[in-house]
Every structure is written in structure tokens, then in C-alpha cells.
Design a protein with these regions (language model features):
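A conserved beta-strand element that flanks and buttresses the S-adenosyl-L-methionine
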Residues: 103
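Conserved class I S-adenosyl-L-methionine
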Residues: 1-36, 47-51, 68-71, 75, 130-161
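Short alpha-helix
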Residues: 162-177
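Short catalytic micro-motifs in class I SAM-dependent methyltransferases
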Residues: 106-110
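Conserved Class I S-adenosyl-L-methionine
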Residues: 17, 45, 180-254
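A short glycine-rich, Lys/Arg-flanked "PGG" loop and its adjoining helix->strand segment in the class I
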Residues: 115-127
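Class I SAM-dependent methyltransferase SAM/SAH-binding core
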Residues: 39-41, 45-91
Length: 254
């Protein structure tokens, strides 16, 4: 699904701390450097790609949203830092074996035909190449809050029975194409956002899984959720933040 409406706040809801972003760039560039051209699907505003490009990784970025790509160009100083393509991850506009590697962060759970997207990645990345995939990492209470919200208002139409933080089904899909799997070292991150702030974002409709819900119903659901969360955890603003681990899987293709 295109993220046109999220352009101006996307980085605020998906960004990492400077320390975690640097560690992620070091980790990914160590896997990608020397492999040749790398494709990132769902490149968005360049949260992953811009630091990788600065680290010397040759890239092509693809996204369904032209406004997101325009924001990437703006962040890069007004000129495309590498080739950018508006396109669909399930029908990649590239010939077979065009790339040596691919990067996928927080994308597959948004793609109804996500297994087709996996097949397309396997098609366009050459044998001996590499696909790096990361799902979402959020503190455990965020999972519970999100699930309870969806139980109240219904699942979004793009829901694909693949949670944003799930990796097991993705691993199985790549293995079905003969890929070998490696789990890369975890990157520690501390989420400073409180539950109250997360609920504020939910009420404001900043997350894709809230976009199909009528505003009045959304705000009523979040108001109920706040009361429930206080009963469940006692406070929506615990001190010190919460620790999460950023996980990447490497799929070596044959």
C-alpha cells in the first residue's frame, strides 16, 4: 500500500536513535559491500538507503509512493543520490538476476501478496546473492495495544496474516526458494516513546492500520484503550523507556 499520506511524519514514526542507525548501517554495509548493486524495496524516505549509500553501497531504490521518493530526494539535498523507481514489489520492473543483493525493512506485512514479493526478490537477485530482511521491532505492550485496537475496530483490508514483527513465515518463504538463512547480530535500541504517546499517534491516525477507520470511531476506540491500559499496566508513562532488539535475517540465494 502507498504511504503518500505519511510522508511528512514517516521518519518520526519509523526512525531509530543515532546510535542504533549507525550500528545498523555498519552491520548491513558489512554484508553488502563489494557485492555490486543492491535493491531496496519500500525504500521510502531513505532511512536505511541514505546511510548505506553514504557508506559506499551502490543502490537502487523502489517504492510504491512517488511522494515518499520525493522526500528522499529532498533529504539528499535535492538530487537523487541513486536511481529511484516508482514500482510494485510484487511485479518488480527489472530483469532476472539484475542485482547482487536486496534490502527489505518493515515492508512485507503491508503487501497482501507478500509471498509473490519474496519470489520477485529471488528472481531479480542473482544466484550467490543476498537478501536482507527486517520486520518491525516494538516493545511488547505495543503489540497488545495494537491487537486490542484492531479487535475493537476490525483488521485493515491489507492485513495479510503476517504481523509486522513476525519472521517465521518469512524465513519459511525464502527457504522454499532454496535460500539459506542467517540471523545477524541483534542491535539493541531503547524506545523512549511512552504508551501515552503511542496512543496519541493512534488517535491521530498516523499508523497505516488506522487509516481505514472513521475518525470518530478511531478516537472512541483509543479512549477506551487508554482506560484499559491504565488498568492493565498502571501507568502510561513509565520512566526510562523500553529496550528492544532490531533483528535482521540474511537469506543467501543459490
Amino acid at each position: 500500500m502507498p504511504f503518500d499520506r505519511a510522508v511528512e511524519y514517516y521518519d518520526r514514526t519509523r526512525g531509530l536513535s543515532e546510535e542504533a542507525s549507525t550500528a545498523m548501517t555498519v552491520l548491513l554495509s558489512s554484508e553488502l559491500r563489494g557485492r555490486g548493486r543492491t535493491l531496496e524495496i519500500g525504500v521510502g524516505t531513505g532511512l536505511v538507503a541514505l546511510p548505506l549509500a553514504a557508506a559506499g553501497v551502490p543502490l537502487v531504490g523502489l517504492d510504491l509512493s512517488a511522494p515518499m521518493l520525493a522526500k528522499l530526494v529532498e533529504k539528499a539535498g535535492g538530487r537523487p543520490p541513486f536511481p529511484l523507481v516508482v514500482g510494485d514489489a510484487t511485479t518488480l520492473p527489472f530483469e532476472e538476476h539484475r542485482f547482487e543483493a536486496a534490502v527489505v525493512r518493515h515492508v512485507l506485512h503491508l503487501v497482501p501478496a507478500w509471498r509473490q514479493a519474496v519470489a520477485e526478490l529471488v528472481r531479480v537477485v542473482a544466484p550467490g546473492g543476498l537478501v536482507l530482511v527486517s520486520s518491525g521491532q516494538v516493545p511488547e505492550p505495543w503489540h497488545e495495544l495494537t491487537d486490542r485496537f484492531m479487535d475493537r475496530v476490525g483488521r485493515p483490508s491489507f492485513a495479510v496474516a503476517l504481523d509486522s514483527w513476525e519472521t517465521g513465515a518469512i524465513v519459511q518463504a525464502f527457504r522454499a526458494h532454496g535460500a539459506e538463512t542467517r540471523r545477524l547480530p541483534r542491535i539493541p535500541e531503547r524506545v523512549a516513546q511512552t504508551m501515552a504517546e503511542f496512543l496519541d499517534q493512534m488517535a491521530a491516525g498516523l499508523h497505516s492500520w488506522t487509516w481505514e477507520v472513521d475518525e470518530e470511531e478511531r478516537r472512541e476506540a483509543v479512549a477506551e484503550l487508554r482506560l484499559w491500559a491504565v488498568e492493565r499496566w498502571g501507568s502510561l508513562d513509565p520512566p526510562g523507556g523500553r529496550d528492544v532488539a532490531i533483528e535482521w535475517h540474511a537469506f543467501d540465494l543459490h
